[in-house]
């Protein structure tokens, strides 16, 4: 019987399993609920993984009792060694027919392995933000990812918070706003459906919902697209903060990553990247300044990319590589380049 290789994209909200043949063809897929073991516990996590793989095996016309050759799991929280060991033990002990071999890695590593063969940077800007560097040898380092209380700079939450803070500080006469606050102030009252600043406090404290608060970023983006100077200023600052995350990991980058035809590959994940044109000026400024300050002449170009396929593909590739099998990947199909720059 033909060998099958599996990959799992484990998200905080949704998860996906892909089954591939040994020549890299996708034979079946299955979707499921969150497999973030920090949120749901290890027991529920492995049950959901087994259930999704079982469903995918049936779709592929395979006996569920025949184990996969390997299963590569790209999970949020996949960098915690103790948690990973516990997950492996649970998978092996409870579901002996699931797979012969397991490889568990981070969501960032699975994403970059879907887009490029050798590694690169994953730069996340959704509700929160994070920057992870994956070198060709698989080693990782990063900047950010500590949540909204400690940072999340350049994220949707950060953009929304900056906008609200600038308005509050300007009205209080604590700090002069860089531009007129009129548009952002009215957008803020409209979005939160309150008549004044006191009404905003409910959304900041008693009824705080991070996703809802971050959603105000969309209104700032609309204002920026309409030409509001303050909205444009905030997005430029967000671009700068995201660029500084890349600058922060430059000293850790294997020089090999600068030498490919793409230059440094940067995989952009999250909805804030839909507003790239608004982020661009600040992003380029931060990279240009950081490159000069660090005298990083080998960093001569970069390419921004977006995934077109699930990071379960990268998970499957890493899982197969772990047991010495190379799964063919068409990286030009898996990810699309949307911006390139040479210094």
UniProtKB/Swiss-Prot annotation:
The modification Phosphoserine is found at residue 76. ATP binds at residues 13, 127, 214, 271, 275. Pfam families: BcrAD_BadFG. The modification N-acetylalanine is found at residue 2. Inhibited by the cysteine modifiers iodoacetamide, N-ethylmaleimide and 5,5'-dithiobis(2-nitrobenzoic acid). Its EC number is 2.7.1.59, 2.7.1.-, 2.7.1.60. One of its GO terms (molecular function) is N-acetylglucosamine kinase activity. Transmembrane segments: none annotated. Keywords: Acetylation, ATP-binding, Immunity, Innate immunity, Kinase, Nucleotide-binding, Phosphoprotein, Transferase. Gene3D superfamilies: 3.30.420.40. The modification Phosphotyrosine is found at residue 205. It comes from the Eukaryota. N-acetyl-D-glucosamine binds at residues 36, 107, 129-130, 145-147, 152. SUPFAM superfamilies: Actin-like ATPase domain. GO terms for biological process: defense response to bacterium; innate immune response; N-acetylglucosamine catabolic process; N-acetylglucosamine metabolic process; N-acetylneuraminate catabolic process; positive regulation of nucleotide-binding oligomerization domain containing 2 signaling pathway; response to muramyl dipeptide; UDP-N-acetylglucosamine biosynthetic process. It catalyses: N-acetyl-D-glucosamine + ATP = N-acetyl-D-glucosamine 6-phosphate + ADP + H(+); aldehydo-N-acetyl-D-mannosamine + ATP = aldehydo-N-acetyl-D-mannosamine 6-phosphate + ADP + H(+); N-acetyl-D-muramoyl-L-alanyl-D-isoglutamine + ATP = 6-O-phospho-N-acetyl-D-muramoyl-L-alanyl-D-isoglutamine + ADP + H(+). Pathway: Amino-sugar metabolism; N-acetylneuraminate degradation. Homodimer. Belongs to the eukaryotic-type N-acetylglucosamine kinase family. Converts endogenous N-acetylglucosamine (GlcNAc), a major component of complex carbohydrates, from lysosomal degradation or nutritional sources into GlcNAc 6-phosphate. Also has N-acetylmannosamine (ManNAc) kinase activity. Involved in the N-glycolylneuraminic acid (Neu5Gc) degradation pathway. Also involved in innate immunity by promoting detection of bacterial peptidoglycan by NOD2: acts by catalyzing phosphorylation of muramyl dipeptide (MDP), a fragment of bacterial peptidoglycan, to generate 6-O-phospho-muramyl dipeptide, which acts as a direct ligand for NOD2. This is N-acetyl-D-glucosamine kinase. The gene is Nagk.
């Amino acid at each position: 019987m033909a060998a099958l290789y599996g990959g799992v994209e484990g998200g905080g909200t949704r998860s996906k399993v892909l089954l591939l043949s040994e020549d890299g063809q996708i034979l079946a897929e299955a979707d499921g609920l969150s497999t973030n073991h920090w949120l749901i516990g290890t027991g529920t996590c492995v049950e959901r993984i087994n259930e999704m793989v079982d469903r995918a095996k049936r779709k592929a016309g395979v006996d569920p009792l025949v184990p996969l050759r390997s299963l590569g799991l790209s999970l949020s929280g996949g960098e915690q060694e103790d948690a990973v060991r516990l997950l492996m033990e649970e998978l092996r002990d409870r579901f002996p027919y699931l797979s012969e071999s397991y490889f568990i890695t981070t969501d960032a590593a699975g994403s970059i392995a879907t887009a490029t063969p050798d590694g690169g940077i994953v730069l996340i800007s959704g509700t929160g933000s994070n920057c992870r560097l994956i070198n060709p040898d698989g080693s990782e380092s990063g900047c950010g990812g500590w949540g909204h209380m400690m940072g999340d700079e350049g994220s949707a939450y950060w953009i929304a918070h900056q906008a609200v803070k600038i308005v509050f500080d300007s009205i209080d006469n604590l700090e002069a706003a860089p531009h007129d606050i009129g548009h952002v102030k009215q957008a803020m009252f409209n979005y939160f459906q309150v008549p004044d600043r006191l009404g905003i406090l409910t959304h900041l404290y008693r009824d705080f919902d991070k996703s809802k608060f971050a959603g105000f970023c969309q209104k700032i983006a609309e204002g920026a697209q309409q030409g509001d100077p303050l909205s444009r200023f905030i997005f430029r600052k967000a671009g700068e903060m995201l660029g500084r995350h890349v600058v922060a990991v430059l000293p850790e980058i294997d020089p090999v990553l600068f030498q490919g035809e793409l230059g440094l590959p940067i995989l952009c994940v999250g909805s804030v990247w839909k507003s790239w044109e608004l982020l661009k000026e600040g992003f380029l400024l931060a990279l240009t300044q950081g490159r000069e300050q660090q005298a990083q002449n080998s960093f001569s170009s970069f390419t921004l990319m977006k995934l077109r396929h699930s990071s379960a593909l990268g998970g499957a590739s890493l899982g197969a590589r772990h047991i010495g099998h190379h799964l063919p990947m068409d990286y030009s199909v898996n990810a699309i380049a949307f911006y390139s720059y040479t210094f």
